[in-house]
Amino acid sequence: MIRLLLVCLCFLFFAPASFVSAQSREQQLDAVKEFKRFFRKWKGTAERVEAILDLKRADCPEAVDALVKVLRHKDLEVREAARKVLAGYRAPATVERMLGGLVDMKDAELRSTFIEVLSRGGQQKLKKVLKEVWEKNRKSLSLKEKYEIARALKRLGGEGFEEILLALTKDKAFEVRLAALDAIGKSRLKKLSKEVLAMLDDPVWQVQQAAIQALGSLRFQDAVAPLIEKLKDPGRLKIDIAEALFRITAWDFGTDYASWKKTWDRLSKLDGFRIPTDAELAKAAKNREKYDKRYGKGGKKNTFAGIPTTSTRVLFVIDVSASMDDLVVDRSKFKGYGSFRKLDIVKAELAKTVKSLGPNTWFNIIAFASKVKKWKKFLVPGTVSYKASALSFIKSLEPLGTGRGYNSAADGSGKTNTFAALMAAFDLDPAKGVVLTGNSKKKALKLDTIYFLTDGRPSIGKYVDIEDILREVHKINETRRIVIHCISIGDFEGSFLKRLAQENGGVFVDLGH
């Protein structure tokens, strides 16, 4: 009897999670009924999100019907929770409920949302439906619908959708064009290589960047000469071009136009010349670290905290929270700064960088703690007058919430609102999140590089959980294409900043403790 009891206990504790978490049809319907009964009564975001996430196990068509209403909720976090749950559903009947009405659906916002969540969930059945949606509704599709179709084909594979993707690369909305280029590159649709090459002349730099990346993935030999010529243009795209050229040729001359031009002109004329195979490229990539000193040589670069950039449109985001008033511990690293206070060290680095800027580099500065303060409303050129103004602003910066002057530690002004600072950098309202406009003239879209410096974890704001912040930044940067370099100073575990940099094409640097 005791042995039988032990066996039962072991089964309860160690049974597969899928068995334990499975719900019967009756349980699923009951969970949905209780959700619908109480959801409107809850006023707090946290309660609503928790209730939505509880429907993960209720993988049934009725749960889809209940969550459809939530997808229109005014709260961004609530809507995101509903998308997350829907993307996780796998039961055939549940998936069919989401797919069933897509072709004839009149609500463009709802259709685009279902396309998003189904593709996030890896539902290959969506591809057949997308063809029907396109054939029947092509002329009436909204910007958001076309954007989500392109993103879905990037996730699920664009093979067989060349005609649709080609049409999307010609859309008037730049977000749609770059999403289509991403899908072409990810799916390596070599039939469209010539069309992608033509996109190097797109008027929006983000679309040019997507075309450059796609050409690198397609390994289109005819793109080499035009890419080399584009190295003569100033700005951050030089780095993207150098990477694409490496992926096509397996050569590594960085942004050095003269070396690329000389080598390509000589070798491409040889009889029997060909670009390396994928296997040869993979081998070259493994050996690349040995030649990092050569990568990026040629051309003047600006540098902040040891991170170089060819960008001519830069934003510096600096933490001035209370903890920036602390002294560094490892003082041997900071002997040349005249002060061991963290903010003084950062101010010295930033001042040095600003002094080095030329009139062709446009820049701005944001200081943040609990709230965000911009030096200017827009990017300005590195002229003598603007640099003098910037240096004066830098000199005036002091940690907030330290008890000095009108600030006190108790007023909450010295906390770290990382999310608000990043949204200010993107020129977005934290409460609204990502909004597709199709407008490429917005001033924020001119920015292409951010240097983000902080000494602590997020402690206040709409989002403080690092996963939430990373998710929101990723959604925004799918169309912005801004490189985010991250710098930490002080006794701060930097895994968040490392990921923020890595996921956004940047470099992470730890200045020291």
Features from the language model and the residues they span:
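Conserved hydrophobic register position within alpha-solenoid helical repeats
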Residues: A51, A82, F114, I149, ...
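Alpha-helix N-cap/helix-start positions at coil->helix boundaries
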Residues: G44-A46, P61, L76-E80, P92, ...
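Structural signature of alpha-helical solenoid repeat scaffolds
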Residues: L53-K56, A87, S119, K154, ...
